[in-house]
């Protein structure tokens, strides 16, 4: 299996724009993905990004897996390696809705360049808009995830601890 890693710099005061190498894949990235998928039977693309990116480009359809790893910081690679090697299951759920194309986001015509905000979605911001108005425009819905799991909380008993005149019992 081949791994292709696509990265973007985005974050506070540095959002993506609808341009090649930002929201859109660059020509070099498209060329790289096409070459890798032509030489390898299986290809996975990892997106090290801080905001959404166009995941609908045809070159990505030839890839067997895509994973948004977001920006995990200097130790985020350890978690990605654990997922890739099967040590842990990628049981998280998507915290955003990813539309098929940027035009599907109602706020996209008003993004950037203005010194004011236009809240054209009214109360239907983010996933609420897509669940209410445009379900057919969703590529990956809010809450989407590869696997689901259950968690169990257990209580651990601790002995009494005397601190001054106070007594605490922890469970």
Task: List each language-model region with its residue ranges.
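C-terminal non-catalytic regions of proteins with extracellular/luminal or membrane-system context
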Residues: 1-171
């Amino acid at each position: 299996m081949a791994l292709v890693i696509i990265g973007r710099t985005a974050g506070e005061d540095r959002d993506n724009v609808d341009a090649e190498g930002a929201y859109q894949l660059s020509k070099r990235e498209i060329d790289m993905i096409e070459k890798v998928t032509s030489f390898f039977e299986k290809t996975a693309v990892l997106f090290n990004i801080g905001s959404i990116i166009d995941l609908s480009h045809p070159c990505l359809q030839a890839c067997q897996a895509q994973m948004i790893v977001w920006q995990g910081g200097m130790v985020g690679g350890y978690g990605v390696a654990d997922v890739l090697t099967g040590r842990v299951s990628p049981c998280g759920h998507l915290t955003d809705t990813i539309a098929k194309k940027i035009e599907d986001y109602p706020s996209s015509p008003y993004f950037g360049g203005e010194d004011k905000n236009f809240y054209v979605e009214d109360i239907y911001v983010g996933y609420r808009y897509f669940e209410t108005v445009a379900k057919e425009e969703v590529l990956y819905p809010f809450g989407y995830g590869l696997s689901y799991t259950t968690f169990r909380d257990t209580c651990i008993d601790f002995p009494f601890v005397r601190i001054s005149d106070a007594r605490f019992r922890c469970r």
